[in-house]
C-alpha cells in the first residue's frame, strides 16, 4: 500500500539577485503579487492539495518569511480594537493555514543539497516539492493535486511538466520520455538546460515534483555538478535507474515569478481576476493603448 503525500518542501534559500535592489534586505519570496507574497500563493496551493506539513528551506536574511506565517499578536489586537473583523480573520488565517517548519540551508550548494536538508523532516515517506519561482493558477484542481493523483495511480515519483517553445528548452530541465496516456509520460531520461539542437523534447519540468524517499540516499552520493552545486536533476536521473518515474503535463497557467517579465505578467493577470480591482484596472490599461 502506497503512503499518502502529507509533506511538502519549499526551497526558499536563493539570493534573488535578479530582483536587486528590492531583494537586498527582503527575500524574493516575500515580493507581493498584488497584495499577497509569492510564497503564500504556493503554500495555499499545497494546502488545497491536501498537504498537512510544510518545510520551508531558508537562507540568511529570511526571517521575515517565518514572521509572515507566525502569529502577530500586536497586529491582531490592533485590528480587533479597530473593529476590522475581515482583516483580522485574514491575518489569523495565514498563521492557522497549515503546520509550517523552517530549516536553514547554511551554504547555497544547489537545489539537490537543499532537498537533502529535509531528510529528517520527510522520514521514509514520499513528498512534494514546490519551487518558489513557479506560481500556477488553476480554477479547477490545483497543480500539485494533479500530481498527487498521478502518484496515487503509479505509486512512484512524478514530475510536473508542460510543453515550452523549442527556443526556450535551454532554460529548463527537459524530459526524454514516452507518452503513455493523456497527460502522462514514462520518463526515460532527463537533460538539464540542453542546447536547442540537443534537446530530446520540449517537455519541461516546471517547479512541481512528487519524489520517493529513495532520493535521499542518491543525493548523498551525488557529486557537485555545474557551478559546484548538487543538482536535483542529476539525482533524479540516477533515481530512474532504480525505479520507474513519470511526468504529468499539468493543467493551469504557470508564471515564472523569478523572472521580472513573468512577475509582471502574474501581477497583471491576478489583478484582473480580482472583482475589487478588475473594472478600474481594465479602464486604466485601456488608457495606455491610446
Question: Residues of each region from the PLM?
Answer:
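Conserved N-terminal catalytic core of the sugar/cofactor nucleotidyltransferase
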Residues: 2-10, 18, 36-126, 137
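Conserved alpha/beta core of the MobA/IspD/sugar-nucleotide pyrophosphorylase nucleotidyltransferase superfamily
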Residues: 3-5, 126, 177, 183-186, ...
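Active-site metal-binding loops of divalent metal-dependent hydrolases
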Residues: 15, 134
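Short catalytic helix/loop segments, enriched in acidic residues and glycine
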Residues: 25-40
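Short, conserved catalytic or adaptor-binding loops enriched in Gly and charged residues
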Residues: 88-99, 179-184, 238-240
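Active-site acidic Asp-centered loop
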Residues: 130-132
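Conserved core of the sugar-phosphate nucleotidyltransferase
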Residues: 135-217, 222, 226
Amino acid at each position: 500500500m502506497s503512503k499518502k503525500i502529507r509533506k511538502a518542501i519549499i526551497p526558499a534559500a536563493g539570493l534573488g539577485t535578479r530582483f536587486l535592489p528590492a531583494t537586498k534586505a527582503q527575500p524574493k519570496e516575500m515580493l507581493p503579487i498584488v497584495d499577497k507574497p509569492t510564497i503564500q500563493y504556493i503554500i495555499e496551493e499545497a494546502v488545497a492539495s491536501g498537504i498537512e506539513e510544510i518545510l520551508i528551506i531558508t537562507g540568511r536574511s529570511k526571517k521575515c518569511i517565518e514572521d509572515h506565517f507566525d502569529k502577530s499578536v500586536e497586529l491582531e489586537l490592533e485590528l480587533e480594537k479597530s473593529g476590522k473583523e475581515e482583516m483580522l480573520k485574514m491575518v489569523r488565517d495565514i498563521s492557522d493555514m497549515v503546520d509550517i517548519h523552517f530549516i536553514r540551508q547554511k551554504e547555497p550548494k544547489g537545489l539537490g543539497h537543499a532537498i537533502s536538508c529535509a531528510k529528517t523532516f520527510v522520514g521514509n515517506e514520499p513528498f512534494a516539492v514546490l519551487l518558489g519561482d513557479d506560481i500556477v493558477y488553476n480554477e479547477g484542481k490545483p497543480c500539485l493535486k494533479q500530481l498527487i493523483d498521478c502518484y496515487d495511480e503509479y505509486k512512484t515519483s512524478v514530475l510536473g511538466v508542460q510543453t515550452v517553445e523549442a527556443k526556450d528548452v535551454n532554460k529548463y530541465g527537459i524530459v526524454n520520455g514516452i507518452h503513455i496516456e493523456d497527460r502522462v509520460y514514462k520518463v526515460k531520461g532527463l537533460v538539464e538546460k540542453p542546447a536547442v539542437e540537443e534537446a530530446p523534447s520540449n517537455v519541461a519540468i516546471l517547479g512541481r515534483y512528487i519524489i520517493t524517499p529513495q532520493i535521499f540516499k542518491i543525493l548523498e552520493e551525488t557529486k557537485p555538478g555545474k557551478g559546484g552545486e548538487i543538482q536535483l536533476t542529476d539525482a533524479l536521473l540516477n533515481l530512474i535507474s532504480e525505479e520507474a518515474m513519470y511526468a504529468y503535463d499539468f493543467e493551469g497557467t504557470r508564471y515564472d515569478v523569478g523572472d521580472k517579465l513573468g512577475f509582471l505578467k502574474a501581477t497583471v493577470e491576478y489583478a484582473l481576476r480580482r472583482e475589487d480591482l478588475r473594472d478600474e484596472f481594465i479602464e486604466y490599461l485601456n488608457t495606455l493603448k491610446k
